[in-house]
């Protein structure tokens, strides 16, 4: 109804978490929504609950929105909650205040509770994790109060005056493939365990591929282009990757 009042055409896009699990399906979705936007049609994306497998459903709409923002190389992602943002204490404490900006790497463990928001399925912990991941990919993320009147208009027209928490985006470019991999851990088909030398190289600043000589053993069944978890010599997960052979 809102879009109709402004004569803006919209189109519903139904997706599932599995549709993000392969590169081909991922790109098909991106191309579909790109064409819609090029023709001035606003995509409204929802999970297709009728065919989604319970074990593979999105955690909440925050997770879905993060995937879409990353996939479409959005300029910004706005996540709405029932509070004004991330507080430096309990939101119920009159002495607490909203953290207006969060830089890359800032430790938020003292401020976030794993409780669910009454505004949706996801809690602030989920929102924060999604926000940090998307901001690391170069996209500005804003957490604001969805129960405030005209909150979206205020964020767009008066961004500095509107109370919210803004995650500062990374300045380092991230390729489309790496964005897809970053959000694909839930689709991992197996694990690749690597030795100490390969772990050190992988943890260096230089981007590298893992060669067979650095692999000690594998778990699960996977093939080319599948997503796998990367485990170090002590059994700790150190990354996620795409199989190239």
Language model: regions and residue ranges:
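C-terminal catalytic "cap/lid" subdomain
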Residues: 1-245
